[in-house]
Amino acid sequence: ETESTPDYLKNIQQQLEEYTKNFNTQVQNAFDSDKIKSEVNNFIESLGKILNTEKKEAPK
């Protein structure tokens, strides 16, 4: 067993960091609830894709 963080967790962490940066920028630019909803949905969708991909690729 390795002590390093699994790649899929690193991917999720990067995705969260990226999303947070983008989200903060958008909130500063304009508080547009439709835009924020859209961004949240996009984020959830992309996170779901990462998780589904990792499940398929994860060693049994």
From Swiss-Prot:
Primary location recorded for the protein, binned into one broad class: secreted
Gene induction: By bacterial infection.
Keywords associated with the record: Antibiotic, Antimicrobial, Fungicide, Immunity, Innate immunity, Secreted
A GO CC term attached to the entry: extracellular space
Superkingdom per UniProt: Eukaryota
Subcellular location(s) of the protein: Secreted
GO BP annotation list: defense response to fungus; defense response to Gram-positive bacterium; innate immune response; killing of cells of another organism
This protein's record includes keyword Secreted: yes
Signal peptide residues on this chain, from the entry's feature table: none
Expression sites by tissue: Hemolymph.
Function noted in UniProt: Antimicrobial protein. Has antibacterial activity against the Gram-positive bacteria M.luteus (MIC=86.6 uM), L.monocytogenes (MIC=86.6 uM), and S.lutea (MIC=86.6 uM). Lacks antibacterial activity against the Gram-positive bacteria B.circulans and S.aureus, and the Gram-negative bacteria E.coli D31, E.coli ATCC 25922, and S.typhimurium. Has antifungal activity against P.pastoris (MIC=86.6 uM) and P.stipitis (MIC=90.9 uM), but lacks antifungal activity against A.niger, C.albicans, C.albidus, C.fructus, C.wickerhamii, F.oxysporum, S.cerevisiae, S.pombe, T.harzianum, and Z.marxianus.
Protein name in the entry: Anionic antimicrobial peptide 2
Biological source species: Galleria mellonella (Greater wax moth)
